[in-house]
């Protein structure tokens, strides 16, 4: 019994040391990241909740100079928040722009189980996008801003810029989405082909049951 007790105590001691090491390493890493990405005097770094489309949605604003041009970055998905990567992504661009990351409705910090499911539709996302654009223009007293979108976000950004060209200095698309239905069809055909090649009958039958896009909502 004494031997077993000693083994357990030894394991507990090792685990305790490992936990201390993990937490200490994280604290050191966090402080290093904060030092490397801290905004200088005259800059801005702010995580905020704003009301968009009648619900609370979150934005992260970062830039080395408050009077630099405003750049709204729209993530992909829908639902694929990229705010957690912002400090790594924006290392250089925050020197020349005030970058605004936005967690769209239902994504990241903007998630809530109380958001009506019917509001998850294209026009609502587009409405949210333009409402945020208007909010940023008013807050920073700008006539125009820059808008950049990735994947699904490139669609929202492109359509918003097309509908309201006078509100933007420029539009930038990353992994530009051009035809959503065609995009889903190509993905479906690829998945079906892979399931057949890999002899994955379950996946193959599931895909056949789902059917080819466009999907009914």
PLM regions with names:
Residues 163-216:
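A catalytic-pocket lid/entrance helix-loop region that shapes and gates access to the active site
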Residues 93-112:
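Conserved alpha/beta-hydrolase
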């Amino acid at each position: 019994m004494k031997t077993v007790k000693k083994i357990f105590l030894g394991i507990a001691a090792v685990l305790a040391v490992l936990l201390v090491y993990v937490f200490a390493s994280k604290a050191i890493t966090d402080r290093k990241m904060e030092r490397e990405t801290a905004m200088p005097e005259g800059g801005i770094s702010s995580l905020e909740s704003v009301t968009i489309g009648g619900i609370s949605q979150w934005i992260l604003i970062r830039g080395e100079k408050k009077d630099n041009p405003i750049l709204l970055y729209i993530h992909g998905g829908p639902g694929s928040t990229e705010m957690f990567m912002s400090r790594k992504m924006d290392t250089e661009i925050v020197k020349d722009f005030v970058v605004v990351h936005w967690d769209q409705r239902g994504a990241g910090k903007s998630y809530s189980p109380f958001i009506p499911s019917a509001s998850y539709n294209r026009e609502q996302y587009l409405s949210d996008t333009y409402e945020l654009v208007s909010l940023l223009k008013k807050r920073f007293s700008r006539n125009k801003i820059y808008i950049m979108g990735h994947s699904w976000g490139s669609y929202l950004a492109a359509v918003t810029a097309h509908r309201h060209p006078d509100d933007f200095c420029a539009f930038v698309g990353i992994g530009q989405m051009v035809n959503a239905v065609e995009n889903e069809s190509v993905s479906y055909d690829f998945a079906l082909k892979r399931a057949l090649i890999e002899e994955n009958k379950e996946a193959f039958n599931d895909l056949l049951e789902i059917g080819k896009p466009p999907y009914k909502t």
